[in-house]
C-alpha cells in the first residue's frame, strides 16, 4: 500500500486538500469553529496582537489563515476537523470515527462509544473516556508526603490520537480504535503508518520518503493538535 501512497505523493495528490463541492461554512460546527479560533490565536507568537487582529476577521477568514479552508471553500480537512455531525454524508458513506472500547479481564467487551466529526472536539471526548488512575509515590527521603501523578501523561495520549487522525489513509475508509484493557491502552488505525517498519522511524535523523495528508497535518499543527 505504501507504493500507492508514493504514487499519490509524486503526482501531488492530497486527499485532505480536496475541495468539497456544495459544502459551506454552514456545514461546520459552531463550537468547533470557536475552539479553532481560540487555538489558532494561541498559536501566534504575539498572542495579544493576534487576538486583536483575529477578532476583526470573520470565521471563514480565520479558517483561511489557519490553512483549514482555501479561499473560503470548504476542504475535506475542514469537514474532518470542524464538520457538524450531520455533515458526515459529504464523505459518501464513510464515517470518520474514533471508537473507544473497554474490555473486561476475560477480553469481553464491557462498554464502547463512538466519536464522530468534528474531530477537533472528538479527541477530548475520546480521551475523557480513558481511565487514567492517579499514582502516589514518595520522591526521596526529604519528605513523608507523597506526590500524585497520572498513570499516563494526558498530552501523550492526545498526541497519539492526533497522530492517528493525521496519518490515516482515508481512501481506505477505516476508523481509529482506542482499546482499553486492564493492563494497557492500545490505539489502532486500520492502515499502515509510514514507514511500515517502525524500527526505521526510530533511527536518528530518519525522514520518511513521503507524507500523507500534508494539508491536514499543517492545519492540525496550527490548531495545536
List the predicted regions and their residue ranges.
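Conserved N-terminal catalytic/coupling substructures associated with nucleotide/phosphate chemistry
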Residues: 1-154, 158-225
Amino acid at each position: 500500500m505504501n507504493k500507492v501512497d508514493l504514487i499519490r505523493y509524486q503526482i501531488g495528490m492530497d486527499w485532505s486538500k480536496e475541495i468539497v463541492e456544495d459544502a459551506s461554512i454552514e456545514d461546520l460546527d459552531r463550537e468547533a469553529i470557536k475552539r479553532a479560533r481560540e487555538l489558532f490565536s494561541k498559536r501566534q507568537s504575539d498572542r495579544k496582537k493576534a487576538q486583536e487582529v483575529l477578532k476583526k476577521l470573520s470565521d471563514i477568514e480565520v479558517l483561511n489563515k489557519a490553512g483549514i479552508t482555501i479561499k473560503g471553500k470548504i476542504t475535506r480537512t475542514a469537514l474532518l476537523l470542524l464538520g457538524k455531525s450531520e455533515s458526515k454524508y459529504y464523505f459518501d458513506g464513510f464515517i470518520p470515527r474514533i471508537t473507544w472500547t473497554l474490555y473486561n479481564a476475560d477480553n469481553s467487551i464491557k462498554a464502547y462509544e463512538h466519536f464522530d466529526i468534528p474531530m477537533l472536539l472528538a479527541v477530548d471526548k475520546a480521551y475523557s473516556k480513558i481511565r487514567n488512575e492517579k499514582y502516589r509515590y514518595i520522591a526521596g527521603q526529604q519528605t513523608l508526603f507523597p506526590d500524585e501523578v497520572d498513570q499516563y501523561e494526558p498530552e501523550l495520549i492526545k498526541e497519539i490520537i492526533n497522530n492517528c487522525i493525521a496519518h490515516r489513509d482515508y481512501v481506505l475508509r477505516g476508523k481509529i480504535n482506542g482499546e482499553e484493557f486492564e493492563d494497557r491502552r492500545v490505539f489502532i488505525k486500520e492502515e499502515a503508518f509510514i514507514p511500515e517498519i517502525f524500527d526505521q522511524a526510530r533511527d536518528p535523523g530518519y525522514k520518511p520518503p513521503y507524507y500523507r495528508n500534508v494539508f491536514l497535518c499543517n492545519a492540525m499543527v496550527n490548531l495545536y493538535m
